[in-house]
Regions:
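Residue-level signature of catalytic and energy-coupling elements of molecular machines
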Residues: 10, 80, 99, 128, ...
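Proline-centered turn/helix-capping motifs that create local helix->coil transitions or kinks
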Residues: 18-25
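Conserved motor-coupling elements within RecA-like helicase/translocase cores
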Residues: 111-145, 150
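Generic beta-strand/beta-sheet core signal
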Residues: 26, 53-55, 100-102, 121-123, ...
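Beta-sheet entry/capping signal
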Residues: 96-98, 132-133, 166-168
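Conserved helicase/translocase motor-coupling segment
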Residues: 25-112
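C-terminal accessory regions
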Residues: 1-6, 13, 19, 83, ...
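Flexible loop/turn segments at secondary-structure boundaries
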Residues: 6-9, 59-61, 105-109, 127, ...
Length: 173
């Protein structure tokens, strides 16, 4: 099964977890990266394809937002915004990227802190769409190891397959 969206490294997780290693990246996308785009400066982020930023041990704990009936994680949100700032400084344009999360409260928290052209939305709301860069905020971090929406394989497949050139996943390992 040939896919035409994402770099081979981004595709690898989804192929292994959901498609029994049946996905193949077309030659036109398998090696593409942010550094192929003019005026993007090489950095540790822009030179990568798939990054997992583990927040275990940071004290970034989820909280319940009663107003939105949803979860949020302030520390993780600050980290995602810092990562976005690093990408923007390296020349990544806001309309090339999106910040997504399974949780509406986290989406709201992020949306209030980014430039207007940087899209912020839920995983479900982003289904069928793609961007050059996706920053995925997983939110869940608690002492009992509860993962909530993260156990929904369909949602996680959608979340992990929206990026074309760079996927940054931020969460508690």
């Amino acid at each position: 099964r040939v896919q035409y969206r994402m770099n081979e490294q981004i595709m690898g997780f989804s192929s292994a977890q959901f498609y029994k290693n049946q996905l193949i990246a077309h030659d036109s996308v398998k090696d593409h990266s942010l550094l192929d785009i003019p005026h993007v400066t090489p950095t540790g982020l822009t030179g990568a394809h798939l990054i997992f930023v583990a927040t275990a041990g940071t004290g970034y704990s989820e909280t319940w937002n009663e107003l939105l009936d949803s979860r949020e994680n302030e520390g993780e949100a600050r980290l995602v915004l810092k990562l976005w700032d690093e990408l923007a400084e390296a020349g990544v344009k806001p309309h090339w990227a999106a910040l997504i999360s399974p949780y509406a409260a986290q989406v709201r928290k992020l949306r209030h802190a980014v430039p207007p052209k940087l899209e912020v939305g839920t995983v479900d709301g982003f289904q069928g769409r793609e961007k050059e860069v996706i920053l995925l905020s997983l939110v869940r971090s608690n002492e009992t190891g509860e993962v909530g929406f993260l156990s929904d394989t369909r949602r996680m497949n959608v979340a992990m397959t929206r990026a074309r050139r760079l996927l940054i996943v931020v969460g508690d390992s």
